[in-house]
Design a protein with these regions (language model features):
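Ser/Thr/Asn(+Pro)-rich, low-complexity disordered segments
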Residues: 1-112, 343-347, 352-368, 379-380, ...
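Catalytic and substrate-binding regions of extracellular carbohydrate-active enzymes
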Residues: 288-483, 522-526, 555, 601-619
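Short Pro-Gly-centered flexible turn/kink motifs
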Residues: 518-532
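Eukaryotic intrinsically disordered, low-complexity regulatory regions
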Residues: 498-505, 526-529
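Non-catalytic terminal regions with compositionally biased, polar/charged low complexity
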Residues: 533-619
């Protein structure tokens, strides 16, 4: 019987289990006990033959159960079969029978989510002796029907777009091929599963292993699925991890390690991310030993007392900290792998940038960095972001993004600089238009759920203490106090004096941070400096807008903006040429043709650039 003839018959819900068994098509060499019981429609004999084929000892079944349980997210959205499997070791025989019967009645023979099918197959692998003969055969039939549906009848075409798509083309065929080796339909299932994994890695990772930003929120479930797939094959003395797939997987893990910080695993989305412990378990299943530097780092981060401590493993044993991929559309700016790290993750694959900002090991901001621009009162529709400039050295990590609308003559430039040497973060938005008019602009950045109580931390952290927001009475400085972390904010594009005129304002409340500005002209620059370095938490500060000159003529601030910030004995310069001139411009005694200069100012007045940017290059 051909595939096209036999598969629809197996999917017929009108057949009883006895008649259905008689319709099975077996490969040559299938065990006589299975074939004989099947052709006779003998439920008890078929169940007994199935158990004979499972060679796992009770001890091995228990060990495999515990291993596979650690490779599932403990998620409230799990289906009934996944939940039942996660509670398998503590359930009684009666409870298990009842829950499986309920699950099979709930799903029927309609297509079930691939993860539910995988859980059903796992019961057949690790718990056949705990099932009654009737339930064993019913579950076996249900799994065969589901596998035929997903693998043969409605296979996912093209690149998988969802986790369910990936499970149906990769893990499910691998496990199904192992569990049903004697069925004719399963002949190529294992090879299909191997091909599915290889194709997914090729299509969703950059050449260095950077994962497509659209998959970041599913990074851990993907690694768990890969770990389960490897576990199934290892139990059959095989391996999924070819040299090519191993290389892709190792690159992915290195690039995604930045998602791990003390006590949490980021996703750059609102999706549940899983835990550091689940991340460690996935790596263990993929061959990462307990002594591997990455697993040691995750163990450090999982310690509730680790945040703010400098207890990391050796830097040269870990991946490079900074990375950015135009193809994957995200970047990581990071100071170190220590537990007191500072980090900015940037996902710019859509019209709104997504940020995840960790300061001194604490997640402070997380979510969409939204922006709204109005031109003469008319809202401007944002375009997609692209990365126009990146820079990295021992002193600073820098990423520059742009939105360009040629039709409306609008360019928005977004700058992010993480000061690695002296700590501190520069954020700046610059708007340029072809025609002068009224520009109204506002951006918002939400706080992380880890620092706002009652927001519901996605990783199950205890609720944070209520933050305190401070606004200086005489200046425009503001601060947010999160338990032992104080973040100071300096709007460098406006005068320090609160009573001096300014074209905008800064807002700070439980919802997050926002800045808005309204000017008349064809450009504006909105820089902000954030400081949280503990030695500077109460240091006196001052900042001032600087005079910018070209060939002895003062340049209006709508054409170029310069600002100097002083915190104690440390000083920084921020300069941006909104409309570059024909000659070098002078700011704080520094002559430059560059569009952007962000620099440290030494005590003697010497300018030491952290980054210099023009439209063509970075130095």
């Amino acid at each position: 019987m051909s595939r096209t003839e036999s598969t629809p018959t197996l999917l017929d819900p009108q057949l009883s289990d006895e008649k259905w068994l008689g319709k099975l098509d077996w490969r040559k060499g299938a065990p006589a006990s299975l074939v004989g019981a099947s052709r006779k429609g003998n439920i008890d004999g078929f169940a007994a033959a199935l158990k004979e084929q499972n060679s796992l000892s009770a001890k091995r079944q228990l060990k495999l159960t515990e291993l596979l349980q650690g490779l599932h997210l403990n998620d409230s959205h799990n289906g009934i079969l996944v939940r039942t499997f996660l509670g398998l070791t503590s359930s009684t025989a009666d409870d298990l029978e009842s829950e499986l019967t309920q699950a099979l009645e709930l799903h029927g023979l309609n297509p079930a989510p691939p993860l539910e099918v995988i859980a059903g197959l796992t019961f057949l692998l690790v718990a056949p002796n705990r099932l009654s003969q009737a339930t064993h055969v019913s579950l076996w039939r249900w799994c065969v029907v589901q596998c035929c549906h997903w693998i043969e009848e409605q296979p996912t075409e093209g690149e998988p777009e969802t986790l369910s798509d990936l499970l149906s083309v990769a893990e499910l065929p691998l496990l199904a091929g192992q569990m049903f080796p004697h069925l004719k339909q399963s002949k190529k299932w294992i090879s299909k599963g191997r091909k599915g994994w290889n194709q997914w890695c090729t299509e969703t990772t950059d050449s260095d292993g950077t994962l497509d930003a659209q998959w970041l929120d599913r990074m851990l479930p993907v690694l768990q699925s890969l770990g389960r797939s490897e576990t199934y094959l290892q139990d059959a003395s095989e391996s999924l991890l070819s040299a090519k797939l191993t290389g892709s997987m190792e690159g992915l893990v290195k690039r995604c390690l930045c998602l791990a910080t003390p006590g949490r695993l980021a996703t750059l989305s609102s999706a549940s991310s899983g835990t550091l412990t689940e991340f460690k378990s996935a790596l263990a299943a993929l061959g990462y030993k307990k002594t591997h530097p990455i697993r040691r780092l995750l163990a450090l981060y999982a310690d509730p007392q680790s945040r703010g401590q400098r207890l990391g493993v050796r830097t040269w044993d870990l991946p490079e900290q900074f990375h950015q991929s135009d193809w994957a559309e995200w970047a990581c700016l990071r100071t170190s792998w220590d537990a007191d790290l500072d980090q900015v993750l940037v996902n710019y694959g859509d019209a709104q940038t997504v940020l995840d900002i960790v300061l001194n090991g604490l997640s402070v901001f997380s979510g969409s960095w939204t922006s709204q621009l109005q031109l003469d009162g008319v809202p401007w529709e944002p375009s997609e972001w692209s990365c126009s400039c990146v820079f990295h050295d021992d002193d600073a990590d820098y990423v520059e993004l742009q939105q360009v609308d040629d039709d409306k003559g609008v360019t928005i430039t977004r700058q992010i600089l993480l000061n690695r040497a002296n700590r501190g973060l520069f954020l700046a938005d610059i708007i340029k238009t072809n025609q002068p008019g009224e520009l109204s602009y506002r951006w918002e950045l939400p706080f992380s759920s880890d620092v706002i109580p009652n927001a519901g931390s996605q990783n199950g952290h205890p609720h944070a203490a209520e933050p305190r927001f401070e606004f200086d009475a005489l200046t425009r400085e503001a601060a947010a106090q999160f338990e032992d972390l104080r973040v100071r904010l300096f709007p460098l594009g406006w005068p320090q004096d609160r009573f001096a005129p300014a074209p905008g304002k800064m807002q700070l409340d439980r919802q997050g941070l926002a800045m808005e500005v309204r000017v008349t002209g064809d450009g504006l620059c909105l820089p902000l400096f954030l400081d949280w370095h503990p030695p500077r938490r109460d240091t006196p500060c001052d900042w001032s807008l600087l005079t910018v000159a070209e060939d002895g003529q003062v340049i209006d601030r709508s054409q170029a903006l310069g600002s100097r910030l002083r915190l104690g004995r440390e000083q920084w310069l921020y300069f941006y040429n909104i409309r570059p001139g024909a000659l070098p411009r002078t700011v704080l005694g520094h002559h430059t043709l560059y569009e952007t200069v962000i620099a440290r100012v030494k005590r003697g007045g010497e300018i030491v650039p952290l980054v210099q940017v023009d439209q063509e290059q970075v130095e």
